[in-house]
C-alpha cells in the first residue's frame, strides 16, 4: 500500500526554514521530524465503521469488567441500539417509579472486541457514541477514556494511542443506579448507534464544519462554509463542492490552505428553498488535499431557508407567514422504548408527518443525529431542545447530578453537531425550569450559532428571544388578555387524553373544570357508554379510567378549540401538542399509577395505531381527500334506540351519512371549533353506518362500519421497513380480530401468539393498552386491545430467511354475544422463498394437556361459562405454539350500566386542613362558603404551614392526592413546598380559581406513602398561600 511521509511544519511557524540544531543536535532534529510525520493511505482517507453489532452485555457491576482480558463469553450477545430497562419491562416497585412507568434502572456493562491492522495505527481513530443513558464510562484495552453524565447527548473519544495490532477491547459502563433520573420513562444503555471513525492525523475536527446561508434571494443564494482543520501543514489545498441531493455539482471552490480555519463563500443560482412542503436539500463536500491526494473528505447536508419572527404576526418561513402545527415527542414515545433504529424512527416520524404536522419538539432533550437527518429529508421543522431542567426536577436527574459542571460541554456538542440541519429553526434550552444561568446559556449558544434564536418551554422567558409558554397558553385569559413584547410560541399545548377505541359522551376534566377554560359541553344529557378496562370497584383511585376519543377529555381546552385559537390569532406562532405518540411513564399524574404504566396524550398510541384525534388533525392540516368516522357501530349491550353522537372528520365540502342505506342527511365541516366535525345524533340499531365525502358535488371518499358479531378469525398484515444505513429491515406485524363476515370486532381482547422463525429478532409486542402487564419482549403473546395488536421485528445482519406463525383462540371473552370459539393460525413468510407449511391445531376444554389429549381442530365449537381452552399449533409435525384462553362472565372488559357511570363517588380519604397542625400565619377560618368540614385554613397574607397525619393501612407506593383550594389573586400562583415524611417532594402552584367566596378547585399530584404513619406538609415560600380546605387522598 502506498504511503507518503510529509514533514509536519505548522502554518503559523515564523521561519519555515529555521534550523533546529540548537535544540539537541541534528539527530534529535531528525527524530522530531519523524515523530511529527503524517502517514496516510490515499485509498481510504476517512473510514467510518458500523460498530453496532456483536456487543456482550451484562446487567451487573464489577471493576473487573473494565479489564482488557476478561472472559465475557457468558454475557448476552446483542446488537445496539439496546435498552435494557425496556427489555426487563414493568415491575411493581420499579426503580423509575410512576414517572418512568415502573421500569428499572441499574448498572450495566457492554464489551466489544475488534481487530485493528498495522496500517490503521498511523491513523487518528475516534469512537463515536450517539447516545448512552446515562453516566457512561468508556475503556479501551483497560485504559479509561472518560465519563459522560448526560444521557441525551452524543460524544466521542480519541482512542488512537491505546490501539494495537490485532485484538482490541472496548468496555462501557452505564450507571443508572440512582433513580428516578427523569420525569418520564428513559432508556438504559447504549440506545443509539456507535461507529468507529478513522482519519488521517490531518483532518476536519469533529463538529467544526459550519454551513450558513447569509443571503438568500430568489435568483441567488450565498453559502458560507467554515471549518477547522487539525494537523494542518504547509502546502495543503482546500476544496469545496456544492451538490444537489442527487449528486450534481453546481458550484466549486479551490484554494491553497492559508489557515487552519478556512472560510469560503459560494453561490447557487437559483437556490431551491427547503420547507416542510418541499424539503430541498444540498450537500457540501469539503476536502483537504496534498497535491492531488485527498487527505480528508467530509460531506455535509444543508438547505436554503429563511426564518423570521415577528411579535404581531408570529413565525415566517421563506417569506410566508406559517403556523407551526407541531407535536412534542419524547424520544422513548412509541413501541420500542429508547432503542430506535433508523427504519423504525423514519416510520414514527413519517406517521406524524402524514397526520399533517410541520414541526416537532423533541421533549425534553436532544436526540441522536439520525432524528435530524430524517426531519431534513421528510420536511419537519424542529424546535431542538437540550434539557428538561437546569437544576433538580426528578430526584436523581442530570440537573441534580451534573448540570453545573457539564452544561457548557453538552450545549457545545449539541449546537455544533446540529447547526447545519435546515430543519432546526429554533433552539430550546429547557422546559419549565428557572435559573440565573439562563442569560449565560443564551449568550454561550449564540456564540456557537448566531443564525438562530433561542427559546424555552416556560423557562426564564425574560431571557429568551422567543417567549415559549407550556400549559398556561391554553387558558382564555392568556389568549384574550395577553400583551406580548416579543414573539410567542405555545411550546406545550393542548393537553388532551384519548384511549383508542374508548368513548364517553360526558366531558372529563383532569383537575375538575378550572377557571378561565373554554367551554366544552357534554355531548348527551346522560352517559351512553359504560365499559371500562378495570371494574371501578377495583380502582385504587378515581383516576383509573380510560379517556374518551371524542376530544372531550382535557386539562383546559379541546384540540379543536385550540386549533381554532391558534389559526385565528395572528400573534400565535403555533403549538406543539402534548404529544404525538403515547409514551411509557407519568402513569400516576393522570391515571393514578399501577396497573396504568403509560401516558395517553398522543394522537397515536404506543403501538402506532392511529386514534380518532389523529384524523381530526389530518382533516384540518392536509389537503389530500380523507374521511374518518367515530365511533364504531358495534354496541352489543346498548339498548336499541339509544342516541349516539356520530362524528365524521373530513376535508371534504360536505359529508352524507347513511344507516342501512337510508340517508340521515348531509353536514358541512365548519371553521368554528365545535363545527369542525360533521355530526349526527343517531338512534342505535344494528347494521351498516356509512359516511360519504363530496367535493364539488362529486364523491371523493367513503368509510363505513358494520355491526360485528363475535371474533372468529385473525387478519394479519405486514409492513416492511427497508434497511437503511447500518440498520437492517424491520417488520411491523399487525393482528386484528374479525367476525366471520370480515368486520372488525372492536372489543377484541384475545391473546395473539407469535412464533418467530429465521433471521429476525423480536423487539417488542405492543397493543396500546395502558394496563397490560404482559412483558413486551419476553412473552410469546400479546392480547388484542380493542381489536388490535402488533409485533415489531428486526432482521439480523445479512438475513436470508424469516417467517412468523400467528395464532389465537378467538371468542367473546365474557361469552355475552356468543359461546362460539374459533382457533385461527397462519404462517407468513417475511424474507426468502415461501415454504410449504402444514399447520395443525389440537385443543382441549377440560384442562387437559392438548399435546397428549388434544382434539384435532376442524371447526368452531361451543363452551360454557368459566372454561379455559388450551391449544397447540404444530408446524410440519412440530409444536411451535402453546396457547390458552379463559372465557366466562367475569372475564375481559368491565361492562356496566347507568348505575356504574361514576362508581368512585364517595370513595377515598379526605382530611380537613383546619384539623392539621398549623404553624405561622396559618389559621382556621369560616369566612367563605361551600367549604368541607368545619372550616378551612387562611394564611391571611403571611407565611406558615399545614401538616396532615395519615395512617396508611394499604401497601406502600404511589398515591394520587388533591388539595382543595381557592384564591383570586390574578397573576399569582402562591407556590407552596410539599413535604412527605420530612422529605421535599415538589413545589405546588395554585392557579386562581375565580373568586374568594365559593370557587373551590382541586390541584392534583402524586406522592409516595409508606405503610403506617405518614406526615404530609404544605409550606409557603414567601408568597403566602391560598385558602386550603382539605387534602383528598384518592
Curated annotation (Swiss-Prot):
Enzyme Commission (EC) number: 3.2.1.31
Annotated CBM6 domain residues: 909-1034
Pfam family, one: Glyco_hydro_2_N
Matching PROSITE patterns: CBM6, GLYCOSYL_HYDROL_F2_2
Keywords recorded for this protein, A-Z: Cytoplasm, Glycosidase, Hydrolase
UniProt induction comment: By ulvan and rhamnose.
SUPFAM superfamilies given in the database record: (Trans)glycosidases, beta-Galactosidase/glucuronidase domain, Galactose-binding domain-like
Localization terms from the record: Cytoplasm
Record keyword Membrane present: no
Entry GO terms, CC: cytoplasm
Catalysed reactions, semicolon-separated: a beta-D-glucuronoside + H2O = D-glucuronate + an alcohol
Entry keyword annotation includes Repeat: no
UniProt cross-references to InterPro entries, sorted A to Z: Beta-gal/glucu_dom_sf (IPR036156), CBM6 (IPR005084), DUF4982 (IPR032311), Fn3_assoc_repeat (IPR026876), Galactose-bd-like_sf (IPR008979), GH2_Domain-Containing (IPR051913), Glyco_hydro_2 (IPR006101), Glyco_hydro_2_AS (IPR023232)
Active-site residues, record numbering mapped to chain: 432 (proton donor)
BP terms from Gene Ontology: carbohydrate metabolic process
Broadest EC class assigned to this enzyme: hydrolase
Record-annotated disulphide pairs: none
Annotated GO MF terms: beta-glucuronidase activity; carbohydrate binding
Function: Glycoside hydrolase that may be involved in ulvan degradation. Ulvan is the main polysaccharide component of the Ulvales (green seaweed) cell wall. It is composed of disaccharide building blocks comprising 3-sulfated rhamnose (Rha3S) linked to D-glucuronic acid (GlcA), L-iduronic acid (IduA), or D-xylose (Xyl).
Family, as annotated: Belongs to the glycosyl hydrolase 2 family.
Protein name stated in the entry: Putative beta-glucuronidase
Native source organism of the sequence: Formosa agariphila (strain DSM 15362 / KCTC 12365 / LMG 23005 / KMM 3901 / M-2Alg 35-1)
Amino acid at each position: 500500500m502506498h504511503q507518503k511521509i510529509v514533514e509536519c511544519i505548522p502554518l503559523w511557524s515564523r521561519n519555515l526554514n529555521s534550523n533546529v540544531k540548537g535544540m539537541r543536535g541534528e539527530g534529535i532534529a531528525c527524530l522530531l521530524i519523524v515523530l511529527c510525520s503524517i502517514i496516510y493511505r490515499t485509498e481510504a482517507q476517512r473510514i467510518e465503521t458500523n460498530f453496532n453489532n456483536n456487543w456482550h452485555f451484562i446487567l451487573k457491576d464489577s471493576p473487573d469488567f473494565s479489564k482488557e482480558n476478561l472472559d465475557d463469553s457468558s454475557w448476552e450477545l446483542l446488537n445496539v441500539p439496546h435498552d435494557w430497562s425496556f427489555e426487563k419491562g414493568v415491575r411493581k416497585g420499579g426503580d423509575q417509579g410512576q414517572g418512568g412507568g415502573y421500569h428499572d434502572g441499574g448498572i450495566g456493562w457492554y464489551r466489544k472486541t475488534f481487530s485493528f491492522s498495522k496500517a490503521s495505527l498511523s491513523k487518528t481513530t475516534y469512537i463515536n457514541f450517539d447516545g448512552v443513558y446515562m453516566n457512561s464510562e468508556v475503556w479501551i484495552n483497560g485504559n479509561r477514556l472518560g465519563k459522560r453524565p448526560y444521557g441525551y447527548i452524543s460524544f466521542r473519544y480519541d482512542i488512537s494511542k491505546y490501539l494495537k495490532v490485532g485484538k482490541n477491547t472496548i468496555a462501557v459502563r452505564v450507571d443508572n443506579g440512582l433513580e428516578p433520573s427523569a420525569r418520564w420513562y428513559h432508556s438504559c444503555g447504549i440506545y443509539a448507534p456507535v461507529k468507529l471513525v478513522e482519519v488521517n492525523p490531518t483532518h476536519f475536527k469533529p463538529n467544526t464544519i459550519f454551513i450558513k446561508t447569509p443571503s438568500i434571494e430568489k435568483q441567488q443564494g450565498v453559502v458560507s462554509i467554515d471549518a477547522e482543520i487539525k494537523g494542518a501543514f504547509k502546502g495543503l489545498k482546500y476544496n469545496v463542492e456544492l451538490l444537489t441531493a442527487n449528486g450534481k455539482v453546481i458550484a466549486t471552490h479551490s484554494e491553497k490552505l492559508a489557515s487552519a480555519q478556512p472560510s469560503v463563500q459560494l453561490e447557487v443560482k437559483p437556490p431551491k428553498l427547503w420547507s416542510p412542503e418541499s424539503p430541498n436539500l444540498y450537500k457540501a463536500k469539503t476536502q483537504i488535499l496534498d497535491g492531488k491526494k485527498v487527505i480528508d473528505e467530509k460531506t455535509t447536508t444543508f438547505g436554503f431557508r429563511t426564518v423570521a419572527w415577528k411579535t404581531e404576526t408570529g413565525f415566517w418561513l421563506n417569506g410566508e407567514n406559517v403556523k407551526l402545527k407541531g407535536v412534542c415527542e419524547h424520544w422513548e414515545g412509541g413501541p420500542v422504548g429508547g432503542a430506535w433504529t433508523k427504519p423504525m424512527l423514519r416510520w414514527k416520524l413519517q406517521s406524524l408527518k402524514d397526520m399533517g404536522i410541520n414541526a416537532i419538539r423533541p421533549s425534553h432533550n436532544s436526540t441522536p443525529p439520525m432524528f435530524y437527518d430524517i426531519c431534513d429529508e421528510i420536511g419537519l421543522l424542529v424546535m431542538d431542545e437540550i434539557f428538561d431542567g437546569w437544576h433538580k426536577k426528578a430526584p436523581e436527574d442530570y440537573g441534580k447530578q451534573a448540570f453545573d459542571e457539564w452544561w457548557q460541554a453538552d450545549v457545545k456538542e449539541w449546537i455544533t453537531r446540529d447547526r447545519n440541519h435546515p430543519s432546526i429553526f429554533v433552539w430550546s434550552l429547557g422546559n419549565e425550569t428557572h435559573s440565573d444561568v439562563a442569560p449565560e446559556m443564551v449568550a454561550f449558544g449564540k456564540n456557537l450559532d448566531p443564525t438562530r434564536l433561542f427559546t424555552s418551554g416556560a423557562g426564564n422567558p425574560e431571557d429568551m428571544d422567543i417567549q415559549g409558554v407550556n400549559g398556561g397558553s391554553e387558558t382564555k385569559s392568556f389568549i384574550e388578555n395577553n400583551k406580548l413584547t416579543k414573539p410567542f410560541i405555545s411550546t406545550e399545548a393542548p393537553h388532551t387524553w384519548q384511549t383508542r377505541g374508548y368513548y364517553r359522551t360526558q366531558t372529563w376534566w383532569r383537575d375538575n373544570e378550572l377557571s378561565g377554560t373554554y367551554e366544552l359541553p357534554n355531548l348527551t344529557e346522560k352517559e351512553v357508554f359504560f365499559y371500562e378496562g378495570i371494574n371501578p370497584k377495583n380502582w385504587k383511585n378515581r383516576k383509573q379510567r380510560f379517556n374518551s376519543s371524542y376530544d372531550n377529555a382535557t386539562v383546559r381546552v379541546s384540540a379543536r378549540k385550540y386549533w381554532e385559537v391558534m389559526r385565528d390569532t395572528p400573534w400565535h406562532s403555533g403549538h406543539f401538542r402534548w404529544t404525538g405518540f403515547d409514551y411509557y411513564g407519568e402513569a400516576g399524574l393522570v391515571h393514578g399509577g399501577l396497573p396504568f404504566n403509560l401516558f395517553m396524550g398522543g394522537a397515536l398510541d404506543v403501538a402506532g395505531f392511529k386514534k380518532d384525534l389523529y384524523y381530526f388533525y389530518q382533516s384540518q392540516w392536509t389537503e389530500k381527500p380523507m374521511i374518518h368516522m367515530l365511533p364504531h357501530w358495534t354496541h352489543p349491550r346498548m339498548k336499541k334506540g339509544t342516541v349516539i353522537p356520530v362524528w365524521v372528520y373530513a376535508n371534504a365540502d360536505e359529508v352524507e351519512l347513511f344507516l342501512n342505506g337510508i340517508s340521515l342527511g348531509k353536514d358541512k365541516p365548519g371553521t368554528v371549533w365545535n363545527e369542525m366535525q360533521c355530526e349526527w345524533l343517531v338512534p342505535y340499531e344494528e347494521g351498516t353506518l356509512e359516511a360519504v365525502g363530496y367535493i364539488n358535488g362529486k364523491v371523493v371518499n367513503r368509510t363505513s362500519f358494520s355491526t360485528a358479531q363475535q371474533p372468529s378469525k385473525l387478519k394479519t398484515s405486514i409492513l416492511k421497513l427497508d434497511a437503511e444505513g447500518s440498520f437492517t429491515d424491520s417488520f411491523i406485524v399487525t393482528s386484528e380480530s374479525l367476525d366471520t363476515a370480515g368486520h372488525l370486532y372492536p372489543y377484541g381482547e384475545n391473546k395473539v401468539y407469535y412464533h418467530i422463525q429465521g433471521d429476525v429478532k423480536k423487539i417488542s409486542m405492543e397493543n396500546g393498552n395502558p394496563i397490560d402487564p404482559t412483558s413486551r419482549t419476553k412473552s410469546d403473546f400479546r392480547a388484542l386491545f380493542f381489536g388490535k395488536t402488533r409485533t415489531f421485528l428486526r432482521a439480523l445482519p445479512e438475513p436470508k430467511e424469516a417467517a412468523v406463525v400467528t395464532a389465537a383462540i378467538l371468542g367473546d371473552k365474557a361469552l355475552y354475544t356468543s359461546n362460539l370459539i374459533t382457533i385461527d393460525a397462519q404462517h407468513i413468510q417475511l424474507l426468502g422463498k415461501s415454504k410449504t407449511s402444514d399447520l395443525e391445531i389440537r385443543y382441549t376444554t377440560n384442562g387437559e394437556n392438548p399435546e397428549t389429549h388434544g382434539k384435532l381442530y376442524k371447526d368452531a365449537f361451543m363452551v360454557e361459562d368459566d372454561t379455559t381452552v388450551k391449544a397447540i399449533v404444530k408446524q410440519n409435525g412440530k409444536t411451535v405454539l402453546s396457547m390458552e384462553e379463559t372465557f366466562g362472565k367475569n372475564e375481559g372488559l368491565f361492562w356496566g350500566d347507568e348505575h356504574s357511570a361514576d362508581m368512585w363517588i364517595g370513595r377515598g380519604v379526605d382530611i380537613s386542613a383546619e384539623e392539621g397542625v398549623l404553624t405561622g400565619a396559618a389559621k382556621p377560618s369560616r369566612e367563605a362558603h361551600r367549604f368541607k368540614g368545619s372550616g378551612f385554613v387562611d394564611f391571611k397574607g403571611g407565611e406558615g404551614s399545614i401538616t396532615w397525619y395519615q395512617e396508611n393501612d394499604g401497601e406502600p407506593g404511589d398515591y394520587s392526592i388533591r388539595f382543595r383550594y381557592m384564591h383570586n389573586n390574578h397573576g399569582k400562583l402562591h407556590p407552596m413546598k410539599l413535604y412527605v415524611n420530612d422529605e421535599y417532594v415538589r413545589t405546588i402552584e395554585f392557579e386562581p380559581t375565580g373568586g374568594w367566596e365559593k370557587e373551590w378547585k382541586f390541584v392534583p399530584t402524586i406522592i409516595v406513602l409508606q405503610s403506617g404513619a405518614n406526615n404530609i406538609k404544605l409550606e409557603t415560600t414567601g408568597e403566602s398561600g391560598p385558602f386550603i380546605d382539605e387534602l383528598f387522598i384518592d
